Each structure stands twice: as structure tokens, then as C-alpha cells.
């Protein structure tokens, strides 16, 4: 599925473009990955998520 809205990780603005029009940073997809109950790597993602502090 192709997402339309994107987010700039530098200044936390939303846009429809691949490059942020304000700062020129490549944008990212702000939606989380799909959840699967049979995911064998969920433990590692939770550990990573707890260790990272987001500033947005």
C-alpha cells in the first residue's frame, strides 16, 4: 500500500512530497508497521523502542 502523507523527521512537519519543502530533508512514512501476532522479532523492537527517545 502506498501512503500519501509523509513527515519530516527534522522539523516534524507533514507534507505530500518526498523531500521536505522547508529544510530539504528526505521525509519518512509516519505510520507504524503492520502488527502480526506471530512476529518473532517483536521482543527486539520493544527493547529498541524503550531505549530511543523521540523529540517530535
Curated annotation (Swiss-Prot):
GO terms of molecular function: snoRNA binding
Signal peptide: none
InterPro entries: H/ACA_rnp_Nop10, H/ACA_rnp_Nop10_sf, Nop10_arc-typ
Gene3D superfamilies named among the record's database cross-references: H/ACA ribonucleoprotein complex, subunit Nop10
Pfam families: Nop10p (PF04135)
Domain of life of the source: Archaea
Protein name, as recorded: Ribosome biogenesis protein Nop10
Protein species of origin: Sulfurisphaera tokodaii (strain DSM 16993 / JCM 10545 / NBRC 100140 / 7)
Amino acid at each position: 500500500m502506498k501512503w500519501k502523507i509523509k513527515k519530516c523527521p527534522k522539523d516534524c512537519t507533514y507534507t505530500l512530497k518526498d523531500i521536505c519543502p522547508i529544510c530539504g530533508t528526505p521525509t519518512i512514512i509516519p505510520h507504524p508497521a503492520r502488527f502480526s501476532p506471530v512476529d518473532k522479532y517483536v521482543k527486539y523492537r520493544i527493547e529498541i523502542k524503550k531505549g530511543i527517545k523521540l523529540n517530535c
